[in-house]
A protein has these predicted regions:
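Pyridoxal 5′-phosphate
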Residues: 1-415, 422-424, 478
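Active-site neighborhood of phospho(di)ester-bond hydrolases with catalytic His/Asp-centered motifs
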Residues: 79, 109, 193, 214-217, ...
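Short amphipathic alpha-helix with an adjacent loop that forms part of the alpha/beta core around
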Residues: 145-155, 450-458, 499-504, 652-656, ...
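Accessory terminal helices/loops
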Residues: 398-421, 425, 560-662, 668-670, ...
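Catalytic core of the metallo-beta-lactamase
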Residues: 415-458, 495-588
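Active-site metal-binding motif and surrounding structural segment of the metallo-beta-lactamase
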Residues: 446-492, 500
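Catalytic cysteine-centered active loop of the rhodanese-like fold, especially the PTP/DSP P-loop
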Residues: 468-469, 691-693, 699-746
């Protein structure tokens, strides 16, 4: 095989994302390869090679009928489920075009795959039907609202539901739905997405009034690019692809015979009662129970987002109640475990629309993990998955991500210094002195459980829980966290310590810095009379200034506060704002002044306070027009990117500059601990350091990085390392490189 293709990683892969796609079974791959090389004829050709190909095509069609229980109707081979959905929708809407009225509706389940509502909306607009596209609500268990269907299906041109949900595994009672649908509209076209039902549920489509049922091969061990569509006898049909008249004129284009051969082998397995590849449902339930046990043993506090009693056993949708989905997925990926955050086709979304429709909490929707395996999973596959999941518990406990059962907590890792904790665009800061004295600045409600666990597990002595002002965009977490940590919160914004708070060899002092709000303050962290960090709240955002659009804000007071800070801070003082809309993570006062044109103009005397206020007001108006960021707006220049290095180029750089080249892993410590980077690149101990993005500000504070060295940054995919490179470039680091594609492409 050409080296441009990826090879199996050295560690055994634990693949638990079967609802997204599956590997092709060896026996199916053999048949596909054989068809490509031997039975490669065009089914439309009249010679023997073509006749043989046609025979394979029709035999596969007959097998499909047996698998889905379709003695009648048509089986149409497609490129996949999405084409099948298009075909069903276009056929129905064209047939009902003349029936459309101002009251017509198109119904779909609120938890359907996005391919369904998007297709309905697209063709409704293109064909000019003007029907209302309505989502059928679901209850907390993900089951469709039968009453809603009864009230609206009478006006429906089409209704679309699904057999099994791809995110939660919830299955619908198709018999009960059929009764409701046909009782109120016997003629309406009904499409059922059966993609996730194939191989997991018994199907008898000819015994139903389902008009269309799309299927996909790659969700069940067949190749990508092949699927099929069941069309009920006498249901409307219009060819979606015209041309040479293949598939009896129903779908033109030379058939994907290798893919169809793959389906043939798949159907053979599904129909063979003696085969041992696909496991019985009882075995799949046992597999699920094993995975649940491993998850609960490792993570402890878990919420399952759908009732297990009404889901297929091959799908688990859950959230870890103290970890974000990104943290869980990054940890799993580092350990060679593949899962997803919801639907793979909707991975860009920050919430799950499926779980939102079910009415779960914000935390569940934002942090859902989908773990799915296929019905051909073996006992050894599941045992390895459970072993790998359970092996993560020491990593989690060592980094305070779960409650540890260690008897000597002092042996666990404690991140001394400055740590940034984030939720969406908000930042919370934890500083831990060398004697375990600690202070928390601008806590976030969503992070209270994590902060509480971290403080108690590491036996930190929290001297204060502080806010820099009363935040406009979020509820205050200060009182709640202080109560849980039994810290005095009686003072203004949590400050009740006189002039300073002692934190080991450090001191924390307070200065009033109004502008963003009238009560804004900044906290200055100093050691040996040097101010090392400034917790400035929303007076500053990285590369810009805080908003002055609130009722108690003042541009002139902001100018005075910034002038005061310029007199107190040093060039290398680390700036710690309450928001980070630019994914910047770490900034010094010097870099901040260079990045903010208006700040520089003020401090250099190019504008007075009145002129500053005028220009700041103009910037705020631009913020309102251009930015969704509530508390600040950055006008910093486009971020610089570092050179991209392949793994081979990295090795060459290490060879040529071994004394000055360092591999910098910017993943979180729990990810770093789950991957043997040193062996992967043959690194000496001094050639590898781990500074996660959450600790990049601390690296500035402690001067851990040397601008004369070459740093090759790595992470899982190259995204986080790319952000860190932009950050380091802004701080004056010239020799920084990104591992192209991250560890995923090594």
């Amino acid at each position: 095989m050409s080296q441009r293709f990826f090879t199996q990683p050295s560690q055994d892969l634990v693949y638990l994302d079967a609802n997204a796609t599956t590997p092709v079974l060896p026996c199916i791959a053999d048949v596909v390869s054989h068809t490509m090389q031997v039975c490669f004829g065009n089914p439309s050709s009249s010679h023997i090679t073509g006749v043989q190909a046609k025979y394979l095509l029709e035999q596969t069609r007959n097998k499909a009928r047996q698998v889905i229980g379709a003695q009648n109707g048509d089986i149409l081979f497609t490129s996949g489920a999405t084409e099948g959905i298009q075909t069903a929708v276009v056929s129905t809407l064209l047939a009902n075009r003349h029936k459309a009225t101002e009251h017509s509706v198109l119904l779909y389940g609120a938890t359907e795959h996005k391919a369904v509502p998007n297709t309905l909306k697209h063709w409704n607009e293109v064909l000019g039907l003007g029907a209302k596209v309505l989502a059928i609500p679901v209850d907390k268990d993900g089951l469709l609202d039968s009453q809603f269907i009864a009230e609206h299906v009478g006006q429906a041109l089409m209704i679309c539901t699904m057999a099994v949900n791809n995110e939660t595994g919830v299955y619908q009672d198709l018999g009960a739905l059929e009764k409701v649908i046909r009782a109120h509209n016997p003629q309406v076209s009904w499409m059922v997405d059966c993609v996730q039902a194939l191989g997991k549920q018994a199907l008898a489509l000819s015994d139903t009034t389902i008009d269309y049922a799309p299927f996909s091969g790659h969700k069940l061990y067949a190749p990508k690019g092949i699927g099929f569509l069941y069309i009920r006898e006498n249901s409307p049909y219009t060819p979606f692809i015209a041309g040479g008249g293949q598939e009896s004129g129903m779908r033109s284009g030379t058939e994907n015979l290798p893919g169809i051969a793959g389906l043939y082998e798949l159907f053979e397995l599904l129909l063979d009662s003696k085969q041992a590849v696909f496991k019985p449902v009882c075995t799949l339930h046992q597999y699920r129970d094993q995975l649940i046990s491993a998850l609960e043993q490792t993570f402890g506090d878990i919420t399952f987002n759908a009732p297990l009693a009404s889901t297929v056993p091959t799908t688990l949708n859950f959230c870890v109640n103290s970890l974000t989905s990104k943290e869980v997925m990054d940890l799993f990926d580092a350990a060679g475990i593949r899962v997803s955050g919801g639907s793979a086709c909707s991975s860009g979304a920050s919430r799950s629309f499926v779980l939102d429709a079910m009415g779960v909490s914000d935390w569940q929707s934002e942090n859902a993990i989908r773990m799915s395996f296929g019905p051909a999973a073996s006992a050894a596959d599941i045992a390895l998955a459970c072993e790998r999941i359970c092996a993560l518990k020491p990593v989690l406990s060592n980094h305070c991500l779960i409650v540890s059962d260690a008897h000597q907590p002092e042996q666990e890792v404690c991140a001394l210094g400055l740590t940034q904790l984030r939720h969406q665009g908000s930042c919370c800061w934890l500083f831990v002195a060398d004697n375990n004295d600690a202070v928390i600045v601008d806590p976030i409600v969503e992070l209270v459980p994590r902060l509480t666990r971290l403080v108690k597990q590491q036996q930190l002595r929290v001297k204060a829980v502080l806010e820099t002002h009363r935040h406009q965009d979020k509820d205050s977490a200060r009182s709640l966290l202080a109560q849980r940590l039994e810290v005095d919160a009686s003072g203004e914004l949590g400050w009740s310590h006189g002039e300073a708070i002692a934190l080991g060899s450090h001191q924390l002092s307070r200065v009033t810095t109004p502008g963003h709000s009238s009560d804004s303050v900044s906290y200055l962290l100093s050691q040996n009379e040097h101010i090392e960090a400034c917790f400035c709240g929303d007076l500053l955002v990285w590369g810009g200034l805080g908003s002055t659009q609130f009722d108690d804000a003042s541009c002139e007071q902001m100018a005075q506060s910034l002038t005061l800070l310029s007199q107190l801070l040093e060039q290398n003082t680390v700036i710690c704002p309450a928001h980070d809309y630019e994914q910047c993570f770490a900034m010094t006062w010097q870099a901040q002044c260079q990045a903010s044109e208006l700040l520089a103009a003020l401090l250099q005397g190019e504008v007075d306070h009145e002129q500053f206020a005028l220009r700041k007001d103009q910037l705020d108006q631009r913020q309102g027009e251009q930015s969704g960021a509530l508390c600040g707006f950055s006008l910093a220049p486009v971020k610089a990117s570092g050179a991209q290095l392949s793994a081979q180029q990295l090795q060459q750089l290490l060879h040529e500059h071994s004394d000055s080249t360092v591999v910098l892993d910017v993943r979180e410590p729990y990810e770093h601990g789950a991957t043997d980077i040193r062996s992967l690149f043959t690194l000496a101990p001094e050639q590898l350091i781990n500074i996660p993005l959450s600790r990049l500000a601390n690296a500035l504070l402690t001067q851990q990085l040397d601008k004369s060295k070459h740093y090759v940054l790595i992470c899982r995919t190259g995204n986080r390392s790319g952000q860190a490179i932009s950050n380091l470039k802004a701080l004056g680091f010239e020799h920084v490189y990104n591992l192209q594609g991250g560890l995923a492409l090594v």
